[in-house]
C-alpha cells in the first residue's frame, strides 16, 4: 500500500516528502481554504515538491462546469488528478475527462455500489471515506474490503484511496483490507512514527554509550 498525504500545507508536505514515504498528495477546497492562499499557487508549489499524483478538486456541481474546471486543473502539471464528487453529474464529467486522457479521483464514496459505478465511468481512483462512516456507526473498513474484493474479481484497474483516515489503526486495517493507497493527514503520520519503546530504547543506547566513554 502506498501513502499520499492529505493536506494543502506546504510545510507538512515538505516534511513528509523528506522522510521518503509519500508518493502523492490529496487536497480539497476545505484544505486549500484553510491555508488562505490562491489555489493555483498552492498546487504549483506542491507539484514542485512531490513527484507523484496530486489531486485538486473541482467546486462546480454541473457536469459541463466540472469538465471545464477539470481541464484547467489538468493543465497545471502532468501529475494533476482531477478530484470529482460522487454524483451523477460527477460521473458524466469523469467519463469525458477520462476519454481526454485526464486522470480522475472520485471522492465522497460511501458504498461499494458508488465505487463500482465510478470505476465503470472510468475513474482512475475512488476515495471511500472511513472516518465519516465510523462517525455514523457504520464500518468503513468493511467498505474498503468489499470494494477491493469486487475490483479484484472483475479485474477493475481503478485504485482505491482510503480517505478520512483518523488514526494509525485505520492505516494498518486499510492495508489488510486491500486498499492500494491511504491518504493520511500529517498528524497521523506523526503518530505512526512514534512508539514509547523506540524512545526508551534510544535513551538506553545513548546512556550506555555515555557510560562506556567514562
Curated annotation (Swiss-Prot):
Enzyme class, spelled out: transferase
Protein keywords: Cytoplasm, Pentose shunt, Schiff base, Transferase
Biochemical pathway: Carbohydrate degradation; pentose phosphate pathway; D-glyceraldehyde 3-phosphate and beta-D-fructose 6-phosphate from D-ribose 5-phosphate and D-xylulose 5-phosphate (non-oxidative stage): step 2/3
The reaction(s) this protein catalyses: D-sedoheptulose 7-phosphate + D-glyceraldehyde 3-phosphate = D-erythrose 4-phosphate + beta-D-fructose 6-phosphate
Subcellular localization, as worded in the UniProt entry: Cytoplasm
EC number: 2.2.1.2
Active site residues per record: 83
A molecular function GO annotation: transaldolase activity
Any GO BP: carbohydrate metabolic process
Source species, domain of life: Bacteria
Annotated GO CC locations: cytoplasm
A Pfam match: TAL_FSA
Function: Transaldolase is important for the balance of metabolites in the pentose-phosphate pathway.
Family stated for the protein in its record: Belongs to the transaldolase family. Type 3B subfamily.
Name of the protein in its database record: Probable transaldolase 1
Organism whose genome encodes this protein: Listeria monocytogenes serovar 1/2a (strain ATCC BAA-679 / EGD-e)
Gene: tal1
Amino acid at each position: 500500500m502506498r501513502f499520499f498525504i492529505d493536506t494543502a500545507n506546504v510545510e507538512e508536505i515538505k516534511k513528509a516528502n523528506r522522510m521518503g514515504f509519500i508518493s502523492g498528495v490529496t487536497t480539497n477546497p476545505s484544505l486549500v481554504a484553510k491555508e488562505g492562499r490562491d489555489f493555483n499557487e498552492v498546487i504549483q508549489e506542491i507539484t514542485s515538491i512531490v513527484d507523484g499524483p496530486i489531486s485538486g478538486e473541482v467546486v462546480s456541481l454541473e457536469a459541463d462546469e466540472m469538465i471545464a474546471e477539470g481541464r484547467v486543473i489538468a493543465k497545471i502539471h502532468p501529475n494533476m488528478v482531477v478530484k470529482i464528487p460522487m454524483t451523477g453529474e460527477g460521473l458524466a464529467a469523469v467519463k469525458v475527462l477520462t476519454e481526454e486522457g485526464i486522470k480522475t479521483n472520485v471522492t465522497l464514496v460511501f458504498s461499494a455500489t458508488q465505487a463500482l459505478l465510478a470505476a465503470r465511468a472510468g475513474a482512475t481512483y475512488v476515495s471511500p471515506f472511513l472516518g465519516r462512516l465510523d462517525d455514523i456507526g457504520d464500518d468503513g473498513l468493511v467498505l474498503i474490503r468489499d470494494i477491493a474484493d469486487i475490483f479484484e474479481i472483475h479485474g477493475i484497474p481503478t485504485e482505491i484511496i482510503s480517505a478520512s483516515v483518523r488514526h494509525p489503526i485505520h492505516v494498518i486495517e486499510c492495508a489488510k483490507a486491500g486498499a492500494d493507497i491511504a491518504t493520511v493527514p500529517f498528524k497521523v503520520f506523526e503518530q505512526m512514527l512514534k512508539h514509547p519503546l523506540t524512545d526508551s530504547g534510544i535513551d538506553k543506547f545513548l546512556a550506555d554509550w555515555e557510560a562506556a566513554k567514562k
